[in-house]
Amino acid sequence: MKNSVQLITYVDRLSGGGFPELRALLDGRLQGLFGGVHALPFFNPIDGADAGFDPTDHTIVDPRLGSWDDVRALAGSVEIMADLIVNHVSAQSSWFQDFIAKGSDSEFADMFMTFGKAFPRGASEQDLLNIYRPRLGCRFQRPRLQIGSQRMLWTTFTPQQIDIDVHSAHGALYLETILDRFAEANVTAIRLDAAGYAIKKAGTSCFMIDETYAFLAKLAEKARDRGMEVLVEIHSYYRDQIEIASKVDRVYDFALPPLILHSLFTGDATALARWLEISPHNAITVLDTHDGIGVIDVGAHSDGRPGLLEPQAIDHLVEEIHRRSEGQSRLATGAAASNLDLYQVNCTYYDALGRNDDDYLIARAIQFFAPGIPQVYYVGLLGGINDMELLGKTGVGRDINRHFYEDREIDLALESPLVKRLSDLIRFRNTHPAFNGSFEVATDDTGSLVLSWNLNTEFAQLVVSFSQGKATITASGCYDFTFSGAIA
């Protein structure tokens, strides 16, 4: 994976079309900004129950976006990351519909995770309470088969997303078939979506248990055999992230976004500096994604071990996002929106900072200086604001940060002072040789955060005074960049 900034985007929501249009945009108005693209699910269909994360067929490109030839053509310009949705398939998939029609006589009957597979002797109330689930509601569904019987099936996320038994013959073959298709299209990295929920075992939380680590290691090996790196997507306790990072190619730094907000809101960089001292260097760093802003990643463990932030600090963080977004994030979070996520605040990162340009650039500068490969979400690239109209149409909280851009909007955004300055930061991160060297984090006598990269005679340094709302970048090659935001 190139050590350069990557773009995260839905193919159609940024380009207004398919893969050919996205390629034209990257080769045109966005030329030189991104070394790679995480193309969010482009499988058939892209407009299912979960915005592409519930494909009926993971091996088919939605024809509205193009074909695998178009994916391969884009791979000739930039590295491509694609999602391998590990945990589930659509209830509308041909495999599940065959199971509905034929029951145990279906050749795909073993592909789906039933209650009985995990609990062959039944489950106590405590067994069920132990199961970790990120959303409200029942984790099981009881569809009626056409032959008249019912089966209790795992549905970790929604009733439309049926969990796979990844150890079954058809489940394993399904995942390997997707890997083969990715490799044929020259995909260079895969993101294992919802991987932490893949293994179910009685007496456990059924989330990131020992057997999950073993499964991920084997799946990652299969991907590497096909020439692809592996990124694991898991929202979890920060120590778990460090452990996961030692076993895979890449892991998300999901603690970074809330810690930066906390520092900007309070003027205190202590927690952020402590995290940057121990955070995995093989990380993918983000501020925003297609999901909300996570808080579980900085919280305490369920067994009581302390997190990166105290509970009251997390409460303040969430309330401050709601305040700075003028209540819009509250309308998109928790009980106010469907697809409930218990650990995320739905809001654009720009709105979470009260649309303060300098605070936003300070946050991006910290991200670009943090260890790892930075990814920038398409809405964040354009300084996007909360899409209240889309939220109102769908009632899905995360749609507040999933805007459909028109060409004119993109042109206007690219001409804005904010996006021009952000583009300068991206180009600096992509081209300065110091970012291929060694990283150091410190705090100076004034409490400012100091992030440094050094490679032989090349250097780049970011100094952020959160108490003054000011940041300065100095680097070899006469680079100098100063910006001041709102004082907390």
UniProtKB/Swiss-Prot annotation:
E.C. numbers: 2.4.1.7
CDD domains (UniProt xref): AmyAc_Sucrose_phosphorylase
Transmembrane segments: none
Disulfide partners: none
Molecular function GO terms recorded: sucrose phosphorylase activity
InterPro entries referenced in this protein's UniProt entry, alphabetically: Glyco_hydro_13_cat_dom, Glycoside_hydrolase_SF, O16G_dom_2, Sucrose_GGa_phosphorylase-rel, Sucrose_phospho
Residues noted as binding sucrose in the record, renumbered to the chain: D50, H88, R191, L192, D193, E233, H290, D291, D341, L342, Y343, Q344, R398
Residues of the active site: D193, E233
One Pfam entry name: Alpha-amylase
GO biological process: carbohydrate metabolic process
Reaction equation(s) it catalyzes: sucrose + phosphate = D-fructose + alpha-D-glucose 1-phosphate
UniProt keyword terms in alphabetical order: Glycosyltransferase, Plasmid, Transferase
Origin superkingdom: Bacteria
Family as reported in the entry's similarity comment: Belongs to the glycosyl hydrolase 13 family. Sucrose phosphorylase subfamily.
Name of this chain's protein: Sucrose phosphorylase
